[in-house]
Amino acid sequence: IEKAVWRLTGELGEWFGVDAGLLTVGKRADIVVLDPQRLDDSLNQYHEAPMEAFGGLQRMVNRGSAVNHVLINGRVAFSGESFAAELGQTRGFGQFLRAG
């Protein structure tokens, strides 16, 4: 498991040349906490969700029911089944990372 996580995080960060993919003191803390028991075929099922900013227009989404929590830059962005109210509204949840 440890090597698989490294291949999907640290190794990709190195390959793209971005300062990401490692949990190290003083670095960004972008973390996804998931329940491996809930990793199943439901991820491939079709789901729609409304986009409130566009009058409720429906969009296709993936439902990651195995995902329990998401932290971006050390701040809780998602927990349980809801997003943080400040996500997308305030600064501090991350930034664009340029390769190289």
Task: Enumerate the predicted regions with their spans.
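Active-site microenvironment of metallo-dependent hydrolases
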Residues: 1-100
